[in-house]
Amino acid sequence: MKPSLPRAWFDLCIIPEHDKVSPRQNTIETKGVLNPVGSNIAPPLNNGVVLIGGPSRHHNWDANDLVSQIRNIIKDDSHTTWTIANSRRTPAGTANLIMNDPILKDKFFQIDDLPLNWIDQKIESCGRIWVTADSVSMIFEALSTKAKVGIIDVPAKRSDRINTIAPNLQKLGWVYHGDATPDIHRPNLNEANRCAMTILKRWPSLMTANSNSSLL
């Protein structure tokens, strides 16, 4: 993320593009937040996951509309085995609506009941991924796979750098959004690997130091 201190004080800054910083030699701009997901293997399209965030500084929340959108996604793609998972930001009322919905309740998993890294593993194993628009990190995790990615609408509080991410991805043709069909040729992101390679190219001594330490 963009540091609170002047960038000139750092050897290197890794900052998401949506933070809109000016180009500098000591700055790598990334598409989204760095994440541990990165797979070149196309997962089966008959596995799907819906990932739910929650209200934030940038987004309001309409639980009834959200549940309606999820229900439509699953009805429209009934041949897919769907899993629904919430996050720690998801309001309890939203979870209750899903658990009382006859179509969704058996597909729903609460984040507090899931093991560590479950979300990352699920993302890498599903060929269809839908994420609520407020969940920027999960959107870019999904885009770091070969899956077909869709964004579920969440009401924005105002137009800002965060809540314009989803519409911008739609314009690029990278995601399903509403009736839009994404471009099948979207890039398979692996920004963590790209940044690591850039760092090693800039400071090759780091690779030597790591090799020496592994021999100890």
Set out the residue ranges of the language-model regions.
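Short, polar loop motifs at secondary-structure junctions
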Residues: 1-5, 14-21, 88-91, 103, ...
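A nucleotide-sugar donor-handling region in carbohydrate enzymes
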Residues: 7-63, 178-179, 184-193
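Short internal beta-strands
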Residues: 14-15, 81-88, 150-153
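Short, charged/polar "capping" segments at the starts of alpha-helices
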Residues: 21-23, 58-60, 89-96, 157-161
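Active-site donor-nucleotide binding/catalytic segment of nucleotide-sugar enzymes
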Residues: 35-92, 112
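Donor nucleotide-activated moiety binding/catalytic core segment of transferases
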Residues: 99-137
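Catalytic binding pocket for nucleotide-activated donors in carbohydrate/polymer assembly enzymes
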Residues: 137-187
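Leloir-type glycosyltransferase catalytic cores
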Residues: 166-216
